[in-house]
Amino acid sequence: PVGIGISHARETLYIDLDSQSQETLDVLKEFLLSPNYNFIGHNIFFDGAILQAQLGQWMNWTACTYGLFRQLANEGWVGQKYGLKQAQLDLLGWDTRGDVELDEWLVAAGVVKNYEHVFSKWSAEERLADFRAGGSIRVDKSRMSLAPPNILGYYCGLDAYSTYKLYTEVLLPAIHRLPAKFQEVFTWYHSLFITNVELLVQQQLRGVYVDVGQLSQFETKTRILIDDYSGQFRRHPEV
């Protein structure tokens, strides 16, 4: 990673790793691996794997807002998006996503898909105009680390801030409003879900990957069964 965003109740910060001294990096590593702090993230399968590879140890992850968003969306629909940018709009009520400034910098700099074959002859202004109008330009987010710290840091900080807000102001209150018998499930949340994510990360770092094709087939079959049983329930004469 080129930087890390951290947020809590009082402040949010972004740490650009390339500009830090070794002493600062050592303190940061000690903080991230401390058992005295609880960490949350949006899709800790990704963030946790990246940090595990860099730190050599699994952090004290206690919640994944991406996982909770999906697990609590009992009335979700096919094609629903659960990414953090969508949650910023749908659950936090933001007017715009937190990556707009970053996306526009990348577009202006030519960090877009098919740049060499299609968009290299376009000026930065033409690319931005097309992007803002919802045209054919697509940002290449896989190379967003090319953005300077003042752009990338602001985006990363907003991600950290919105993840914290999503957890404390939306997801936790939703759990607390559940009937007692359902709240009991979340007392086992760490052992049921977080440890499974850790296992998947440890396997992947050792070359054992999830069979995504089989998993997708299983998801499709499960969705068909759920829809079938839901239909039977709604058609029941006593419902």
Regions found by a protein language model. Name each.
Residues E169-W188, G231-V239:
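Surface-exposed helix-capping loop/turn segments at secondary-structure junctions
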Residues Q80, M144, P148, L152-L158, ...:
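Secondary-structure capping and boundary motifs in well-ordered enzyme cores
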Residues V2-L178, L200:
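Active-site-proximal helix-loop-helix substrate-binding element of RNase H-like nuclease domains
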Residues W188-V239:
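Extended, well-ordered alpha-helical scaffold/bundle regions in very large, multi-domain proteins
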